[in-house]
Amino acid sequence: KAKSAKNYLAGTNGYLLESVQREMVRRGYSEDDLNVGGFRIVTTFDKNAQAAAVESVKSSGVSDEKGLRIGLTSVKTDTGEVIAMYGGADYLKNQLSNADQAVGLAGSTFKPFALAAAFEDGIDLSSTWDGSSPRTIRGYKLKNEGNVSYGNISLLTATEKSVNTVFVDMAGKVGVDKVKDSAIRAGVPANTVGLVADPTTVLGTASPTTMDMAGAYATFANRGERVTPTTIKEIARGGTVEYELNPTKQRAFDTEIADEVNYALQKVVTNGTGYAATGIGRPAAGKTGTTDNNKSAWFVGYTPQVATAVMLVKQDSKGNAISLYGTGGGGSVHGADYPAHIWTDYMSIAMSDMESEDFQGSNDYGNDSGYNNYGNYNNYSRPSSPSSKPSSSSSGSPGGSGNSSSKPSGTASSSASASGKPKASAKPTP
């Protein structure tokens, strides 16, 4: 029995099982309950989406690199159902899930929370801001990516280009407490490491998990209604159904606020740092993120139906966060590189049987969108080794734009603790 259980936990399956078991504990089941067994659990995982998650990571060409952690979580925006998770290559070799346990500095993926707070404060995308670089703002010496000085630009352009000086300035004027509150309302846990009321929080000094970020961005996709990510549809024991998923939606933002965020993040995809995501061939919104010393790289993106977060972090033999520089034989790694391409590979397959939907409410913000900007995935090419490696160029900016010429921002650990031995008391039903 022990050998059978151990074999079942091998590969990526163990991360799914352990995530389900952790959720059962949160729902009031004890470790003794789980060890006794007798449960029939129907999970939210989608077989096609899960296979796509595993394949997209493997196809990246870097999944086997020593110390590299790649995490992915994908959720249905209207119900919070987790349809796919990539926690690692083999649970038996490493029990810490890269999807819902390991954390990484969020970088510029936190800028949408500042946008929402600004919109609530009456600021709109056409407002003009000083995008000069360098600038000293509230005691912080800041540079834009590559120290590019944009001069006076609109907030929309600042979002597309991920202009650090504008966002730190805006966060200070709106109120850093409001930016922090916006992140929490969207779904980022209040106890997230590094989530503080500080102007630089907008540059991503907090360290969430991919499940945290997929859930938070799903709130925008769901037009301001938050649902908690879940891996469980039904729990039955002894023939009795003890739990059935009935998603509870909580209003986090007014519909108009979420719609404006969605519009801005669509422009990040069509005109800005998230351009790789156009490869899914349907309307998408999202944000890249990179961090100081290249210690993490993110892409968090969504369609109206599905939100997915992809994170890359790296650790040394002692579990300390180290730079991603050199991953895949290239230079610095940014959100527009491996994370965005893994996201695009995954979403193209996971959503292949879903209707293409437009984001509602976009026309209120002058969206002439031209979704012909979205390419046909059959003509899309992800990075291949070695000709399409991430750029080796970098700069000294405190917050990276997420494009392949950016240098990231912030400092924090991308580690998390793992404890306990593999258990196989409750077998998930994909």
Give a label for each model feature.
Residues 123-179, 226, 238-267:
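Conserved catalytic neighborhood of penicillin-recognizing serine enzymes
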